[in-house]
Amino acid sequence: IIAEPWDSTTDTAISTRVSKLFADYGRNFYGFITATSATVSDDEILKIAQIVESSADSHIYGITLTDLACANSVYTDESTDLPSKLKRGQFTRTIVFASEYDANDSAYRLNKYLVASALGRMFSVNFSGSMTTITLKFKQAPSLQPTNLTQSQDTNLSARNVNKYAIYSNDTYIIQEGVMSSGMWADERHGSDWLQDLIQTTVYNVLYQSKTKIPQTDDGVARLMAAVANAIDQAVINGFVAPGVWNSDPFGDLESGAYLEKGYYLYAPSVNDQLQNEREARKSPVIQAGIKLAGAIHSVPIIVNINR
């Protein structure tokens, strides 16, 4: 855990501190929140979100919204509240939670850290196991109080891609919906970052651990592709990737509508087709992967036909 104290009355802008934190320790952490009793302005939060989005290293930035004023207004393209700006900015690495908070009420005092609880649950996933991946929806936030929202408030927050820890009519408390500010599912953001890191590490280890070299030949590229396949196989084992129909653009021999029996498809052109300058720079031909995510079921339509 890296803690950076900040005092709004004496310190430089918090976004400046975050930039320095990234420069000094960016590869040593993944998720972070702005946890401070001082007020962080919307402009500063937007700057931090931009820093996170453009960072060379993968990070997730969490915000707990304790001012629920935006829950009382319908979202439009002209809405000026913070969640609306983050949504329109299509920030895929920022996640916002709304939570009822009262500094004078011991039951609600910790609610300003709701996003920390949610990220803690998400980051506890062990991707090395079998069927271990999760969806953030339906999870609990131990020791924190749910927010009692009206239907219209819930709708208004959801329209802004704001998550909640809500009370349901069957007396259960759950996190919903589990999305980033862009609308991307949070578990897919997390899983994609994990898989990217695993592929990079696995391929690097092939180069690093070879007692001779990986030749710049089709056989050499095949060894690298095997390493990529190894990494994605673990994503199949842990439930992040699954067999399914490829509905995106075609590439290589993969056509739109094709069924991916393994959950993924790998392609690399022949070394013989490489540009000479790439060959002289000792680059591998580009390796492409088409991956089908397993997704998650969040709702169930049920039709009951009754006959007498």
Which functions belong to the PLM regions below?
Residues E4, A35, Y267-P269:
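A structural detector for beta-sheet-dominated domains
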Residues E177-R308:
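Structured, hydrophobic secondary-structure cores that serve as assembly/anchoring elements
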Residues I1-L21:
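A broadly used, surface-exposed interaction patch
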Residues D24-T212, P243-V245, D249-Y265:
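A glycine- and small-residue-enriched flexible loop/hinge signal that marks low-structured segments
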